[in-house]
């Protein structure tokens, strides 16, 4: 891999506009059997999503993935969501008790619409075995597997039965995998996405490194079906994190899934904690993302998300912000 690049190195090139207003542009996306309002999903992290936010997202036709850090609550969560006619979308790990959990779901005839196998290094036999286990016991569930960063990994997980793969090793704002281990897609996440997407035959979820709404459009251009976002969704009124006041400003905590705050111990730590400025309501952020993406589609010369996939682009090394600090 030479000529790698990241989000801030790329500018998409406009094509002739065919709409009178950006409101004519359609940002919806289909993943599995369901259609969603935006190709965006809040990260399945404890300071980003909880039951209340999951319910809000599902009711308003946004995709969501519940985190896996309160495993005992998952069964009641699935029941609760499905009893309201909403989709149930959960996360699992790969430890022994997760195998039992999947069998328990099957025994109780509970089939979540989406199951995300969520571990830091998803190119592993542990993940392959779990994909096969879920497909055997819950064949109707749509399985997202990750996280990975290479075409080989995408192909192997797809071949094992994954319905989608999640791409991104350590590019997140509160992820320190790149620093602690020397490995990952941090700094070249967009190029890694492009590399993986070329090998994929099923949808890819780009996960990590998104710092602006324009990065969503860039992810679509380079092959993502859905884009997972953490830091841009942190710090909202509804966010689960704790609120603190500093110098008269409100902040909310945001921490990585493998951080000591998450694990309750300082062992194999690959995440950190930060405080992000309070952002107001989640609804406002989602509306702004939709409007910005509608504008992206109009610049791409189309009316649908797919029009972004065919635009030209240039690589401008680290200069698109001209020294402006946008994040």
Swiss-Prot record:
This protein's name: GMP reductase
PANTHER family tied to this protein: GMP REDUCTASE
Gene: guaC
GO molecular function, one term: oxidoreductase activity, acting on the CH-CH group of donors
Binding site for NADP(+): 204-227
One Pfam family linked to the record: IMPDH
Catalytic activity: IMP + NH4(+) + NADP(+) = GMP + NADPH + 2 H(+)
Disulfide bonds: none
Gene Ontology BP, a term: purine nucleotide metabolic process
Record key words, sorted: NADP, Oxidoreductase
Gene Ontology annotations for the cellular component aspect, listed alphabetically: cytosol; GMP reductase complex
Functional summary from the UniProt entry: Catalyzes the irreversible NADPH-dependent deamination of GMP to IMP. It functions in the conversion of nucleobase, nucleoside and nucleotide derivatives of G to A nucleotides, and in maintaining the intracellular balance of A and G nucleotides.
Family named by the database record: Belongs to the IMPDH/GMPR family. GuaC type 2 subfamily.
Catalytic residue positions: 175
EC number of this enzyme: 1.7.1.7
Keyword NADP: yes
Enzyme class: oxidoreductase
